[in-house]
């Protein structure tokens, strides 16, 4: 005879991998067209000048330049500032 009753099965034992969201390029960092600046769910950070917005709300650079984060009317905005030509 078994001395222990059958144990119940747990319904919770699993976890999904992190989605690697967040800011990928910091303020003042150099970017080229196509570089991802922010990966996010929804528009926590809004696109400004010289940046594009992907269908999954990813913000990416459209031109070569430096990243600039700012807050306007309680909205975080990211821009890419063009670097002045040196020649």
UniProtKB/Swiss-Prot annotation:
Stretches for region Disordered: 1-24
- Position of the signal peptide: none
Might you name a Gene Ontology BP term for this protein? translation
| Name of the encoding gene | rpmA
CC terms in the record's Gene Ontology section: ribonucleoprotein complex; ribosome
Q: Which UniProt keywords apply?
A: Ribonucleoprotein, Ribosomal protein
Q: Which PROSITE patterns does this chain map to?
A: RIBOSOMAL_L27
- The source's superkingdom equals Bacteria
- Give the protein's recorded name: Large ribosomal subunit protein bL27
User: A single Gene Ontology molecular function, please?
Assistant: structural constituent of ribosome
NCBIfam families listed in its UniProt record = L27 (TIGR00062)
Look up keyword Ribonucleoprotein and say if it applies: yes
Q: What HAMAP family does the record tag this protein with? A: Ribosomal_bL27
The family database entries (InterPro entries) matched by this protein are listed as: Ribosomal_bL27 (IPR001684), Ribosomal_bL27_CS (IPR018261)
| Family statement drawn from the similarity comment of this UniProt entry | Belongs to the bacterial ribosomal protein bL27 family.
